[in-house]
Every structure is written in C-alpha cells, then in structure tokens.
C-alpha cells in the first residue's frame, strides 16, 4: 500500500485561509511543514492552544490525521525547526483580516459572515470609499444612466409642449362645405315656373289695387275659367294659383255671410236662380263686362 500517496494532502498546506497560515520553508521539501501547526488551531486537535506552547512542550504527542486503516504516520519534519510563515505578497491576507492574532498560529473559520465584514478595510465597507487596490462596487444603473434618462425625458417633454402652446393662438375653426348645407332650408315665397308654390308656403299679402280688381271680378263672376284666371293673374302680376286660392276663400266667406243672414243668395242680373247655387267651376251666365273667352257652354 502506497502511504505516501494517501498522505499527500499533508504536502500542500493551505496558505490562503488566513493571515497566520504557515507554509514549508524554501530550504526543505514541501512535506517539511509539521502537521501539528496545521491542526493546532482547531478545537478537535489542539483545543485552541497556541503553536508556541505546543512546540516548547515536547511531552505532548504529535497529532496525526485520522485514518480509517488504523496506520500511524511518522512526523514529516523534525521538531527543531520552526515553520515558516506564508509569503504576505499574495493571498487575501493583504486586503482584509479576520480578527485573529498572528501569534496564535491556527486557522480561524467563523461560522457566519459578520466577523469577516467587520474586519474589512474601508475599501470594502458599506458605502465608504477607501484607497484599497479594488474600486468600490457600483450599482448596475448609476447616476450617469439616471441623468441620461432624465435629460432625454426633458427633451421629449419640451418637444411635446412647444407646438401645443402655439397652436391655440394661431388655429381657427375651419368650416367645410358640407357644414354650410342647411338640413332644414327656410321656406321661401318663390313660385315655380308652372305657377305652383311650395306646399305650406308663406301667406301672400295683396295690395289695395289687387284686392279691388279681384273684388270687382268676383262681383260679376264667382267662378272663373282657366283662361280668365291666367288673364287676371297676368294683369295683376300674380300667378294662377294665387288667383284661384283667393276666389276659393272669397266664396267660402260669402257662404258664411249668407248662412248668418238667413237669406237666399241672389244671383247676378240676367241669370236664373238655379244657376246661382251651382257649385260647379263652370259659370252658366255672363256679365256685361266679361270677356268673350270666359263664356263656356
């Protein structure tokens, strides 16, 4: 069985676990570091005693690493030589300490991170900026990014606000062509070419001359023919519809007066009484002043 291979972990002592770790001297092979100093600081073997006490007292047996095979190992180095300290030019000991004295000669492994953080210099402090070899940690998004975002937001806000402030003073409500069209156009008294006015048109105001000529024509003939209506309309500067409506209203007014008076309507001279009550549009009698064109059979 190769015992040298099994005990190879003793040939490479740990030099990066603390400021007071030990390594083998340069004039001796790597296995010259005593195993007593490597495990003296742990409570399992040395009970936390300093290494100087173990070296001065030769009565204590040399502690050996545990072995499942039950084989004892000799001491790899004589007790007359003191172990050499680790080179301080490398390792984490030059940046921070763990709060353990160098003369203790043992490893110090705290159970939590509180002691390690308490012993760190200013360069590793919470918020302090020191002159250590490493720069202080920076947040992922620093003040430069925040300032950049703020300046970009200000530019965007200025671009949005500048046109809005000038638009209300310059813009005027625009009127389109479809807005000019009236949904309910006002009624006008304009008569079409055929003489038919719009339904529900305005009331016609007749002049005194027009009323006198219409009353004179109604006295001689209550019912007019189409030709006579056209002639009277042309003479009085009216249309045929206006003359027709006036004669209808005048006949209704005459009948109302006769009903109120209780007398029989008298026909024009030279006409029989039967023809006076005829409600037909054609007239069976003629007046002396009537034109020949108004005579109908």
Curated annotation (Swiss-Prot):
CDD domains given for it? homeodomain (cd00086)
Q: Under the GO molecular function aspect, what terms does this record hold?
A: DNA binding; DNA-binding transcription activator activity, RNA polymerase II-specific; protein domain specific binding; RNA polymerase II cis-regulatory region sequence-specific DNA binding; sequence-specific DNA binding
GO terms of biological process kind: anatomical structure formation involved in morphogenesis; anatomical structure morphogenesis; anterior/posterior pattern specification; embryonic skeletal system morphogenesis; facial nerve structural organization; facial nucleus development; positive regulation of transcription by RNA polymerase II; rhombomere 4 development
Motif Antp-type hexapeptide is found at: 175-180
Query: Which controlled-vocabulary keywords does the entry list?
Result: Developmental protein, DNA-binding, Homeobox, Nucleus, Transcription, Transcription regulation
Signal peptide per UniProt = none
**Which residue ranges traverse the bilayer?**
none
Give a single Pfam family match.
Homeodomain
| UniProt key word DNA-binding | yes
Region (Disordered) residue spans: 38-74, 124-144, 251-297
Instruction: Write down the SMART domains for this protein, in alphabetical order.
Output: HOX
Q: Which InterPro entries match?
A: HD (IPR001356), HD_metazoa (IPR020479), Homeobox_CS (IPR017970), Homeodomain-like_sf (IPR009057), HXA1/B1/D1 (IPR046327)
Read off the PROSITE patterns from this record: HOMEOBOX_1, HOMEOBOX_2
Record's compositionally biased regions (Polar residues):
52-70, 280-297
SUPFAM superfamilies this protein is in?
Homeodomain-like
Q: Quote the function comment for this protein.
A: Sequence-specific transcription factor which is part of a developmental regulatory system that provides cells with specific positional identities on the anterior-posterior axis. Acts on the anterior body structures.
Q: What is this protein called?
A: Homeobox protein Hox-B1
Q: What is the lineage of its organism?
A: Eukaryota, Metazoa, Chordata, Craniata, Vertebrata
* Gene name of this polypeptide: Hoxb1
């Amino acid at each position: 069985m190769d015992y040298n291979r099994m005990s190879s972990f003793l040939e490479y002592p740990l030099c990066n676990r603390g400021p007071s770790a030990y390594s083998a001297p340069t004039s001796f092979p790597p296995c010259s570091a005593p195993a007593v100093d490597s495990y003296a600081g742990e409570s399992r073997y040395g009970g936390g005693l300093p290494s100087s006490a173990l070296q001065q007292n030769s009565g204590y047996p040399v502690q050996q690493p545990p072995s499942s095979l039950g084989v004892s190992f000799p001491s790899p180095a004589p007790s007359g030589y003191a172990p050499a300290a680790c080179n301080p030019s490398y390792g984490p000991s030059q940046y921070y300490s763990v709060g353990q004295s160098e003369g203790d000669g043992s490893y110090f492994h705290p159970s939590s991170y509180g002691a390690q953080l308490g012993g760190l210099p200013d360069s590793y402090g919470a918020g302090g900026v020191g002159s250590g070899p490493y720069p202080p940690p920076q947040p992922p998004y620093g003040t430069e990014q925040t300032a950049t975002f703020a300046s970009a937001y200000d530019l965007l806000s200025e671009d949005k606000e500048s046109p809005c402030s000038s638009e209300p003073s310059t813009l005027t409500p625009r009127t389109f062509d479809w807005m000019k069209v009236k949904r309910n156009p006002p009624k006008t008294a304009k008569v079409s070419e055929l003489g038919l006015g719009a339904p529900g048109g305005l009331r016609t105001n007749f002049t005194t001359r027009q009323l006198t000529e219409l009353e004179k024509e109604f006295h001689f003939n209550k019912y007019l023919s189409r030709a006579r209506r056209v002639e009277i309309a042309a003479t009085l500067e009216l249309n045929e519809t206006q003359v027709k409506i006036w004669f209808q209203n005048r006949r209704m007014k005459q009948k109302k007066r006769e009903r109120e008076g209780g007398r029989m309507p008298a026909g024009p001279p030279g006409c029989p009484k039967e023809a006076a009550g005829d409600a037909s549009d054609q007239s069976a009698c003629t007046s002396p002043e009537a034109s020949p064109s108004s005579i109908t059979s």
